[in-house]
């Protein structure tokens, strides 16, 4: 989860988020180098009186500043397209969970089970226990098995929502009448927090998401107790 005054990204807990963090660093380094070069050129122009007043054209320079930006854009685009493909690819999911957005709570249905569904509301501040996180705790957590590919089917009952869990690299729009999907895979157990990331009304800030990733055996025990 994020902490106050945190400058970096949340710790990656899924392969997708690890790729996104690496791509962020890769792109940021390219932007930094370009910005430094532009700043150097501007500084040189402002601090020197030397000018090429007789130069009418320079084909070599024009060729370089046409090809070089194209190469840089390709270096940015290729990793981005690879990650987009990875995020859309879902092969043989071990579990499917349907998520519906409402004003202002989430409902979940485990489609592989006959009758396993529940609503998830934010815990009011007055009901928080010691150690609970304000505006992030829910009454029913989404319990999922770790180290397995899980398909999330995401939609909405009323207005636009967005189901987002930053540490897993997830952010999928919940659109009425449309079913979007995302892949959830966690490398380690733990609690992972998210929130609705699309303005959806007056209580938009009170739609937290809590995923509890557990070993498969614990998930089987939990699902048996819920049915």
From Swiss-Prot:
It comes from the Eukaryota. Cu cation A2 binds at residues 196, 198, 200, 204. It holds the Pfam family COX2_TM. Binds a dinuclear copper A center per subunit. Mg(2+) binds at residue 198. It is found in: Mitochondrion inner membrane. It catalyses: 4 Fe(II)-[cytochrome c] + O2 + 8 H(+)(in) = 4 Fe(III)-[cytochrome c] + 2 H2O + 4 H(+)(out). InterPro entries: CcO_II, CcO_II-like_C, CcO_II_C, Copper_CuA, Cupredoxin, Cyt_c_oxidase_su2, Cyt_c_oxidase_su2_TM_dom, Cyt_c_oxidase_su2_TM_sf. One of its GO terms (biological process) is ATP synthesis coupled electron transport. One of its GO terms (molecular function) is copper ion binding. The keyword RNA-binding does not apply. Cu cation A1 binds at residues 161, 196, 200, 207. Its EC number is 7.1.1.9. Keywords: Copper, Electron transport, Magnesium, Membrane, Metal-binding, Mitochondrion, Mitochondrion inner membrane, Respiratory chain, Translocase, Transmembrane, Transmembrane helix, Transport. Gene3D superfamilies: 1.10.287.90, Cupredoxins - blue copper proteins. Residues 46-59 are mitochondrial matrix. The chain crosses the membrane at residues 15-45, 60-87. Component of the cytochrome c oxidase (complex IV, CIV), a multisubunit enzyme composed of 14 subunits. The complex is composed of a catalytic core of 3 subunits MT-CO1, MT-CO2 and MT-CO3, encoded in the mitochondrial DNA, and 11 supernumerary subunits COX4I, COX5A, COX5B, COX6A, COX6B, COX6C, COX7A, COX7B, COX7C, COX8 and NDUFA4, which are encoded in the nuclear genome. Belongs to the cytochrome c oxidase subunit 2 family. This is Cytochrome c oxidase subunit 2.
């Amino acid at each position: 989860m994020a902490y106050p005054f945190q400058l970096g990204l949340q710790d990656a807990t899924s392969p997708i988020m690890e790729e996104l963090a690496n791509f962020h660093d890769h792109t940021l380094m390219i932007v930094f180098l370009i910005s430094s070069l532009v700043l150097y050129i501007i500084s040189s122009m402002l601090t020197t009186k030397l000018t090429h007043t007789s130069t009418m054209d320079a084909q070599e320079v024009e060729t370089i500043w046409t090809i070089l930006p194209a190469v840089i854009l390709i270096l940015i685009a290729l990793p981005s397209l690879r990650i987009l493909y990875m995020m859309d690819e879902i092969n043989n999911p071990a579990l499917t969970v349907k998520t519906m957005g409402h004003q202002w709570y989430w409902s979940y249905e485990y489609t592989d089970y006959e009758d396993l569904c529940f609503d998830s509301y934010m815990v009011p501040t007055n009901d928080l226990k010691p150690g609970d996180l304000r505006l992030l705790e829910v009454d029913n957590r989404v319990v999922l098995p770790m180290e397995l590919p899980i398909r999330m089917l995401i939609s909405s009952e009323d207005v636009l929502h967005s189901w987002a869990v930053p540490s897993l690299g997830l952010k999928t729009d919940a659109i009425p009448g449309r079913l979007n999907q995302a892949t959830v895979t966690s490398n380690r157990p733990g609690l992972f927090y998210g929130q609705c990331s699309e303005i959806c009304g007056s209580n938009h800030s009170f739609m937290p998401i809590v995923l509890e990733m557990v070993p498969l055996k614990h998930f089987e025990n939990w699902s048996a107790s819920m049915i």
